[in-house]
Every structure is written in structure tokens, then in C-alpha cells.
Amino acid sequence: MELLIHRLSAIFLTLAINALYLTSSQNITEEFYQSTCSAVSRGYFSALRTGWYTSVITIELSNIKETKCNGTDTKVKLIKQELDKYKNAVTELQLLMQNTPAANNRARREAPQYMNYTINTTKNLNVSISKKRKRRFLGFLLGVGSAIASGIAVSKVLHLEGEVNKIKNALLSTNKAVVSLSNGVSVLTSKVLDLKNYINNQLLPIVNQQSCRISNIETVIEFQQKNSRLLEINREFSVNAGVTTPLSTYMLTNSELLSLINDMPITNDQKKLMSSNVQIVRQQSYSIMSIIKEEVLAYVVQLPIYGVIDTPCWKLHTSPLCTTNIKEGSNICLTRTDRGWYCDNAGSVSFFPQADTCKVQSNRVFCDTMNSLTLPSEVSLCNTDIFNSKYDCKIMTSKTDISSSVITSLGAIVSCYGKTKCTASNKNRGIIKTFSNGCDYVSNKGVDTVSVGNTLYYVNKLEGKNLYVKGEPIINYYDPLVFPSDEFDASISQVNEKINQSLAFIRRSDELLHNVNTGKSTTNIMITTIIIVIIVVLLSLIAIGLLLYCKAKNTPVTLSKDQLSGINNIAFSK
């Protein structure tokens, strides 16, 4: 009957959540900016974890010694088997406790302790874990090391002498009590008596006094149900190295969780938020194995405190923006890298670059501030004016025009380039739109799927308003010859600076080339002048020579007086 009630409660809760989801999703709006190939989904509200709340859960155990269940009856065998499971679980938890980081009170960092603990635990429990699983194990432990620091601190204190008895004494007459631990921290503690009461008051009298003669199977079933919580807790702690997340219903039942939320020192709005989103709360909570002592299993439950709620949040979706008017293989691309969740927080903006770490329930965004960056409010200017002077917007560049699609809250961004075929389809009408080369956007109204090449994307079916903001793609403003490629973590100003450096280099090269050409021209002129001078000199010399020659040839012969006399004239001497 109790199981049926839980199932009906879960069904009604699911229906209520779906109704709330459909109602609130209608307030979502989405703006697509053609100039930057990006879209912003608005209408969400924050639930940001800013702290942790720790509580100690104790499960009281029974000291079961040797039993007299040696019969051959099926019910007797089942009872004996379940009792053996119970004792084995307690033994494994004791082994587990000896190797937990909290058992070592020396001042060491939690993460290395967890690694030692993981190795020791796998040896002691003879658990066969592959190398791949060990790597995943250690990665998980390193990742949660800082998140569970407060829970580890409480868990360590429980190992000090007298701490468990202090808790037991505080819980003698009540199921809940605030206990001040030795480190000065006060924690809410609670006890679970179901299993111990059933074993001591109902099961053991049958086992020890009636030699396990059980008249009906209901006794067996009831013990199995009561025992299942301890067995599952043991399994979870053993498999997950003493730290589990999310918080299962075995670690903390729904009624226990709601009761604990109600006791937390937070506002009524925060309590209402957590109570109506228990699944999200479980996903962001931890349970930490502490100690098994004095017939008490104690472990720490660490719940999130959402210190920032109801502030506006928005999600930025981005896709590659490339040129399309250049021959294939010569395009340039630009992509905004500031995609993720943004939430207003005390005058600034909390930015969550890993959007998957945030959980969305209806129009509520649950994020952990440990995964956030704090940015000035001017960061929102990048959506409307990426070249603004107040905030340097983040981008990446490349020369590879890859086609892809990004599913948004109310539609899809489609980056279609080259010879890739990109379409939007309706399940009843088939293809209803074929995208041309470039970046485009399609609303989810009447669209069920988007196809890019051989990849099929299913669009979200939320309701809301879409706005298509047209604009010249900013990639067209850049010269492919000087556009820097493969800048994976850059900004608009850095890219522009590199472009200016490239342009300056080109200008300098042109100047050098001009100077070289000018020098060559001067040399040529000088050589030509020298040649001309030489030719003129040679021609002048030749002219002078010819003139002298001609003058010498035209001069008349003059005879002396003796030559004109007859005596000396040879002609007359004969």
C-alpha cells in the first residue's frame, strides 16, 4: 500500500511539473542575430547555488548474532539469506569506514586521501575494477574534492572519540536534534529507526524463540523491504568510493528530504523552490560515508543552498559564420565563443560557459556558482553590437567552413556551407525549407527536424516568441588576405590588432619594394648616362681625328728655291 501511495504521488508530481512546464515556457522569447550567427533565449529565472547545508543521518542497527535458521523450508532459507545480507552489509561498511578520508585525522588534502581510499577499498572488498573505471573513479573524486569540503569537515569530526555517543544521546527522545560538534559547528542530526525496530521487535523473536518457524511469506517480504535501504546504501558507498551523487531515495527518502528542507535556515521562497524541484536538488546533492560505530551508521548529507533566485537568466547559442562568395577552400570563418548561460547577480553577471552543468526545470535555471565566471553587465552588449567599446567580445577564427546546426530553445541555427544540403522538415509535410549557403535560423513552429548533410537534429517543442534580427554578416567586413586563422581564444580587439599588424607588414613590404625599385631606376639612369657620355666622347674623338685627317690631305705641296733651279733639278740634269 505504501508503495502504491509513493507511485501515485510521483505520477501527480510529474503531471503538475508538466503543467507548470507548459505554462511557464510560453514566456520564453528568442532573438536571432543574423550579423553574428547567434541567438539569445530569454525568459528564464535563476536558482544559483551559493553554499552548502550539511546534516547527519543516522541509521540505528541491531546486533544480530548467530541465528537458529537451519531448516529446509523456503521461508526459513529466505530469512537466513536476508540476515546474511544484513550482516555482510554491516561488515562491508565497517571496512569501508576504515579507509574513508574522514577516518584519518591528519591534515591532508581530501583529494589525495580519496585516491588512497579508492585503491585500498578496492583491495579490501575484492572489487574488480578495470583501468578505465579506475581513471573515471579518480577523475570523479578530484572533481568533487572542493565541492564536498564542508561535508568532509563534518565527516571527520564524527570520528573523534565521543562524537557518535553525543549524537545518540541527543536523539534519545526525538528523531531530530541540533548537535554542536567538537569543531564548533552545529549540525541537524536525524535518526532512522525502522530497520532496528523491526529486527528487534518482530524478526528476532521469531528467529530465536520459534526456530525460524515462519507461518507466512509476508514476514520475509517485509524484512526484505526494510533491509533494502541498508543494502542499497552499502552498495552505493562501495561502488562510489564513499561519496555519492546524486542523492538517492535510499540515502534520503522524499519525506526525509522535504522535512530537512523545511528545517534549513533559508527563506520561505527558497524552501518553496527546493520543495517543488526535489529531483534537481537531488542531482546537486552529495552523501558522504562517515562512520559505523556503537550500532549506528552515520553519514553526511550535503544539500545545495540557492542564495540567488528569481533574477533574469538567458542562454546564448552560437554557430560558425563564414564567407560564401569565395571559391571553395578559401573561406574565412568567425564564431562567438561566449556561448552558455548568463544570470544577473548583484549588479554583475554570472556566466556559466559549460551550459550542460546547469539544470533547467520549466523556466528555472539551476546552476552552481563554483562553475561560473563573474562578468560586467556590459557583456550583454555583444548580442546587439559585437564591436562595442565597453566590452571586448570573445570569438574564434578559422578557415574551415564546416556545416552544422545548433538547437536552441525555440528553434535552430543552421550554418550551411559548401555543397552540404541543409533542410528543415515537418513530420507530416516533409521538407518545408532548404537553406542556402550561409547562417540562417528557423523557428520550431511547424518544424520537427533539421537536417545538415547526414545528421538529423530534433528541435525543442517549447512555446514562445521568436524575433529574427537581420544584419550584414560581420565576416564580410574582413579581408581574407589578412584575416588571422586558428585563433581559438581571442577577442574582437585582438583579431583587429592582428589584422592591423598584417596590414602594417604589407605596407612596410610595399615601401621596401618601392625603395628597391627606386634604387634600381637610379642605377639604370647612371649607367645609361655613363654610356651616353662614353659614346659622345668616342664620337668626338672620331670627329676630331677625321677633321685632322681631312685637313692634312687638302694642304698644297711647296717647293724650295733650290728645287726650282735648273742645277739641282733632276729633270734637267739628264
Swiss-Prot record:
Side of membrane Extracellular, spans: 26-524
Highest taxon of the lineage: Viruses
A GO biological-process term: symbiont entry into host cell
Residues annotated as signal peptide: 1-25
Region Fusion peptide, annotated ranges: 137-157
GO CC entries: host cell Golgi membrane; host cell plasma membrane; membrane; viral envelope; virion membrane
InterPro entries for the chain: Fusion_F0_Paramyxovir (IPR000776)
UniProtKB keywords: Cleavage on pair of basic residues, Coiled coil, Disulfide bond, Fusion of virus membrane with host cell membrane, Fusion of virus membrane with host membrane, Glycoprotein, Host cell membrane, Host Golgi apparatus, Host membrane, Host-virus interaction, Lipoprotein, Membrane, Palmitate, Signal, Syncytium formation induced by viral infection, Transmembrane, Transmembrane helix, Viral attachment to host cell, Viral attachment to host entry receptor, Viral envelope protein, Viral penetration into host cytoplasm, Virion, Virus entry into host cell
Transmembrane segments: 525-550
Lipidation (S-palmitoyl cysteine): C550
Record topological domains on the Cytoplasmic side: 551-574
Site (Cleavage): R109, E110, R136, F137
Glycan-carrying positions: N27, N70, N116, N120, N126, N500
Disulfide bonds: C37-C439, C69-C212, C313-C343, C322-C333, C358-C367, C382-C393, C416-C422
Coiled coil regions in record: 76-96, 158-209, 481-516
Family: Belongs to the paramyxoviruses fusion glycoprotein family.
Full protein name: Fusion glycoprotein F0
Naturally occurring in which organism (per UniProt): Human respiratory syncytial virus B (strain B1)
Gene coding for it: F
